[in-house]
């Protein structure tokens, strides 16, 4: 590897916002985020890959540091013998993928000698470059877990620090390198790309992929090839996915596309603002675009949604109220009214074990008690047949079944750190942990294509806690996974769609806030990834999650209500983020530090108020109507008069932060009723029924 000096040459690829998650050396529990620029250059018939800190005046004392147990890090030391070993150790680390979306805290790097490190030391420590002829392989992260990262391994077994592409597009780098070398998947690990040989013919024929007019423009210097390729890549996505078109419109991708056609001189071939507005209008239906004279800015004004209504919540549905709505054969009467009451106030804990089976679809709402008894017998037999499948596999068989072996390994690691502070799962050899493990292993037999993905234990834990029964917990979990399945698929299409939909809703509510996030490289809302992936499981206390999930399971007041919950949380934090001028790292840090500090009743009030505000809007964009499942500006809204009992206590929703310049305050009157004293948790966890 060559010294990381200044390199000149023809730039083939260039990407800013490529981070190294550095190590602190003597401080073993912290990691830093160093933003840099990655380039691929041609020089004297040699191809050079070069990374260096983005700011030439980099002062490592200003770097923010994260705990190592909460971020994805491949450590890089100066000793060559250690580099290969440590790199391999971290690459195979279970933490490296899941914890990319689990960063919880950052710290300033302390100086061991009391002096700030010099600019030269900080820069030379992390800058690197190498010739493509020295490249042995490229390790890719598992797709879907936050932003992508790549790790370069050289032929002398030196493993370079992982490069994290916070802004995406790591695939463009791979495509650029494939012009010069052949990259093939490793037979042992499909995420590892092996460098086989030089491939100059690919480079020579690359221009033929473009049509002749475009090639002529490139040769004449009127068209930036890199920008054109970027535009073509994303234009294909626009045609395939209208939601992607919406997101790209929000990100002002059109400026970049048309800039590639204008050439390097911004004063020539300037596209009229009116045409840009027309393009964005098509890409973002329902939003009005105003072009300002100031170049480079498009102001997308939000539609006047009108006054936001005041929302009230009620007490949790009691066992007595539930019983009154059951007929002599055990059928639930007036299901819609029951769902409305649950949405308004949740359920008392004594009722959850029974009601959750209906909310999750395990029991049909119109089933009789006898039919449910028969169903449970059938499901019990089915469960144990599947459980026997993995229980009966011998060690010799498992040695030849790498997928099952990998599933078991992930499950064991996840189970051992899932809700261990909860009395239900604390201690060694806890029956709750054993059941958690067995249910997840059985789910691998139930859906072997999906198997187990990190994070699924977070979804199962509250279900097992409430059901206290292995079979019932499994089938409730299977039903919940039917809803959440796309979140955990390898392509992560469900997560991508939700992030795009969330951006659409947030821009409608406050385009100014969205523009600020975009200016801080946070426009794709990746800091909400964990919220969506496991439905806020790590953002609220365990008891609050029980309340939040049962409210969401009613599917009221609209489709994708969880996205409005995200909007409500971001709305509450908007003022602090903008007034303190938070950048990318500060936004990520701030959002993660909200964990366990969010008032669930306050957020439910705000989210419902937002939904009612949108329903009453006569100019609601069609894209938003589709996201929320609204037809003709109509939605199934919970009746404010639900609960005829005069003793029902209603709590007012705090004023929206969008409607006031003051920081939002949590209402003391909105106290939750599911305090630890009201939800009995027996110290004798052996009351679980493993069946």
UniProtKB/Swiss-Prot annotation:
It comes from the Eukaryota. The modification N-acetylalanine is found at residue 2. The modification Phosphoserine is found at residues 23, 70, 205, 274, 640, 675. Ubiquitous. Residues 346-556 form the Rab-GAP TBC domain. Pfam families: PH_RBD, RabGAP-TBC. One of its GO terms (biological process) is regulation of GTPase activity. SMART domains: TBC. Interacts with non-phosphorylated form of RAB8A; phosphorylation of RAB8A at 'Thr-72' disrupts this interaction. Interacts with ARMC12. This is TBC1 domain family member 15. The gene is TBC1D15.
């Amino acid at each position: 590897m060559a010294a990381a000096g200044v390199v000149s040459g023809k730039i083939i690829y260039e990407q800013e916002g490529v981070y190294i998650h550095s190590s602190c050396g003597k401080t073993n529990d912290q990691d830093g985020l160093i933003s840099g620029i990655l380039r691929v250059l041609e020089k004297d018939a040699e191809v050079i890959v070069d990374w260096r800190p983005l700011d030439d005046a980099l002062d490592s004392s200003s770097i923010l540091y994260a705990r190592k147990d909460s971020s994805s890090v491949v450590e890089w030391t100066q000793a060559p013998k250690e580099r290969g070993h440590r790199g391999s150790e971290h690459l195979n680390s279970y933490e490296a993928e899941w914890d990319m979306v689990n960063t919880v805290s950052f710290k300033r790097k302390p100086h061991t000698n009391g002096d700030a490190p010099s600019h030269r030391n900080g820069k030379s420590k992390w800058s690197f470059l190498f010739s493509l002829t020295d490249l042995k392989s490229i390790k890719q992260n598992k797709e879907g877990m936050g932003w992508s990262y790549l790790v370069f391994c050289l032929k002398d077994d030196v493993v370079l620090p992982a490069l994290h592409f916070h802004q995406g597009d790591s695939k463009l780098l791979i495509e650029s390198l494939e012009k010069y070398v052949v990259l093939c998947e490793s037979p042992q690990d499909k995420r590892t790309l092996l460098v086989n040989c030089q491939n100059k013919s690919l480079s020579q024929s690359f221009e033929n992929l473009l049509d002749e007019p475009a090639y002529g423009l490139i040769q004449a210097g009127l068209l930036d090839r890199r920008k054109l390729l970027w535009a073509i890549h994303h234009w294909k996505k626009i045609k395939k996915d209208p939601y992607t078109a919406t997101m790209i419109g929000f990100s002002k991708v059109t400026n970049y596309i048309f800039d590639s056609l204008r050439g390097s001189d911004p004063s020539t071939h300037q596209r009229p603002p009116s045409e840009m507005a027309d393009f964005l209008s098509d890409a973002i239906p329902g939003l009005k675009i105003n072009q300002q004279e100031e170049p480079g800015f498009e102001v997308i004004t939000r539609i006047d949604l009108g006054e936001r209504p005041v929302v009230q919540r009620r007490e949790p549905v009691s066992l007595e109220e539930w019983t009154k709505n059951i007929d002599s054969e055990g059928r639930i009467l007036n299901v819609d009214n029951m769902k409305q009451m649950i949405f308004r106030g949740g359920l008392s804990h004594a009722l959850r074990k029974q009601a959750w089976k209906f909310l999750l679809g395990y029991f049909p709402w119109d089933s009789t008690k006898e039919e449910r008894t028969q169903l449970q017998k059938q499901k019990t037999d089915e469960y144990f047949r599947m459980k026997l499948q993995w229980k009966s596999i011998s060690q010799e068989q498992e040695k030849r079944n790498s997928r099952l072996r990998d599933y078991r390994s992930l499950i064991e690691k996840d189970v051992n750190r899932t809700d261990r502070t909860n009395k239900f799962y604390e201690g060694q050899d806890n029956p709750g942990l054993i059941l958690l493990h067995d249910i997840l292993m059985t789910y691998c037999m139930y859906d072997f294509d999906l198997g187990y993905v990190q994070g699924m234990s977070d979804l199962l834990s509250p279900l097992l806690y409430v059901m206290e029964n292995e079979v019932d917990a499994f089938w409730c979990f299977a039903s919940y996974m039917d809803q959440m399945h796309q979140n955990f698929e390898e392509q992560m299409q469900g997560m991508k769609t939700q992030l795009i939909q969330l951006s659409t809703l947030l821009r409608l509510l406050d385009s100014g806030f969205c523009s600020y996030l975009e200016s801080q490289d946070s426009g794709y809302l990746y800091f909400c990834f964990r919220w969506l992936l496991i439905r806020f499981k790590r953002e609220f206390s365990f008891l609050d999650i029980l309340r939040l999930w049962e409210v969401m399971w009613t599917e009221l007041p609209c489709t994708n209500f969880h996205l409005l919950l995200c909007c409500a949380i971001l709305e509450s934090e908007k003022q602090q983020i903008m007034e303190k001028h938070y950048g990318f790292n500060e936004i990520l840090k701030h959002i993660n530090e909200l964990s366990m500090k969010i008032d669930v009743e306050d957020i439910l009030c705000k989210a419902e108020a937002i939904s009612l505000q949108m329903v009453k809007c006569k100019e609601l964009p069609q894209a938003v109507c589709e996201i929320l499942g609204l037809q003709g500006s109509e939605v199934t809204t919970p009746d404010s008069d639900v609960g005829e009992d005069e003793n029902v206590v209603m709590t007012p929703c705090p004023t929206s932060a969008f409607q006031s310049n003051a920081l939002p305050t949590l209402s003391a009157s909105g106290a939750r009723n599911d305090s630890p004293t009201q939800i009995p948790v027996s110290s004798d966890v052996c009351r679980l029924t493993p069946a």
